[in-house]
Regions:
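N-terminal module-boundary/linker segments of secreted carbohydrate-active enzymes
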Residues: 3-80, 94-98
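Extracellular-facing segments of soluble proteins and assemblies that are Gly/Ser/Thr-biased and enriched
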Residues: 89-185
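Residue-level marker of positions within ordered structural domains that often coincide
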Residues: 109, 215, 230
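Substrate-binding/catalytic groove segments of enzymes
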Residues: 113-116, 207, 216-220, 234-236
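...with weaker cross-activation on analogous glycine-rich loops/strands in unrelated enzymes
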Residues: 161-219
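Low-complexity, Gly/Ser/Thr/Pro-rich intrinsically disordered linker/tail segments
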Residues: 221-276
Length: 276
């Protein structure tokens, strides 16, 4: 007791001040977009893009309420709810179609649809066939004979969103990580932009989408990743396994094999989808 009393007297005499530690808050539960929901790390600011660019589109895409669970296409709750920090508010359909590559195709398709850039909505299928939305809109439908695919005019012109969704579902059936690999090219980490992917083509393969990017005054960058997965499920923003409290991935810490919650990517998997 004497030693404790002396210690207390010493503290009072030195006027020792205790500072309250306030942790950095990464999640704003009231935010309904990436920009408003997930705060950048302390000392970092989001890199700004033109409002009509894809990075701004996905940064401001609606999210489901904070704390929402990831659901499968059949209405069942995904057993593992520990991998995500946010969920994009976009339907996944009622069939097991919108998986990993399909989710990225969906976001690019929705972006071009919102921009009314209909000529840019075109995706290669796994066999190399280019499936153009404008041909679908004009009434053409796929004629599949084994590995051979061609257009067959069987319907009327239809530019409705409902028809556009049917087009995307057909793309999901015949496209995947293998076709996405053929449309993409490797990039260096210092070139990273929202819309780039970590992609490993295969059966199965996997891909995740870079959905946001921030930078500090020293030029260090960090980014957010999102994914769909198998079976088809909500498109969700991933946690960082290295720090579950901080969803940002830091370029300075990135090494290969690159570990994400659902997949480990090899070197050379960082790619950009080239707009040909």
């Amino acid at each position: 007791m004497i030693k404790q009393d002396l210690l207390l007297q010493h503290i009072k005499s030195k006027k020792v001040k205790y500072k309250t530690f306030i942790p950095h808050l990464f999640i704003n539960p009231d935010g309904m977009t990436l920009e408003d929901r997930i705060n950048p790390p302390e000392g970092f600011s989001r890199i700004q893009f033109d409002e009509d660019d894809f990075p701004s589109f996905i940064r401001n895409f609606p999210l489901k309420e904070d704390g929402s669970q990831v659901y499968f296409y059949n209405g069942m709750i995904k057993p593992n709810q520990d991998e995500h920090v946010a969920i994009f508010d976009i339907d996944i359909g009622e069939r097991d179609l919108q998986q990993c590559a399909d989710s990225i195709i969906r976001m690019y398709g929705e972006y071009y649809w919102a921009q009314e850039a209909y000529d840019k909505i075109a995706f290669h299928l796994t066999n190399g066939f280019l499936m153009e939305y404008t041909k679908w809109r004009d009434g053409n439908r796929l004629l599949v004979d084994g590995n051979n695919v061609s257009w067959n005019h069987t319907s009327e012109y239809d530019d409705s969103y409902e028809s556009f969704r049917k087009y995307l579902d057909m793309v999901f059936i015949y496209a995947g990580t293998l076709s996405l690999s053929e449309e993409s090219r490797p990039i260096d980490l210092d070139m990273l932009l929202p819309g780039d992917m970590f992609l490993q083509g295969g059966s199965p393969g996997h891909c995740v989408l870079v959905v946001d990017l921030a930078e500090n005054q020293q030029g260090d960058k960090c980014f957010l990743l999102a994914q769909g997965y198998m079976p088809a499920q909500d498109f969700h923003v991933l946690k960082n396994p290295k720090n579950p409290q901080d969803p940002w991935y830091y370029a300075s810490e990135l090494s290969y094999p690159f570990i994400t919650p659902s997949w480990t990517f090899p070197e050379g998997s960082l790619v950009r989808w080239f707009d040909e």
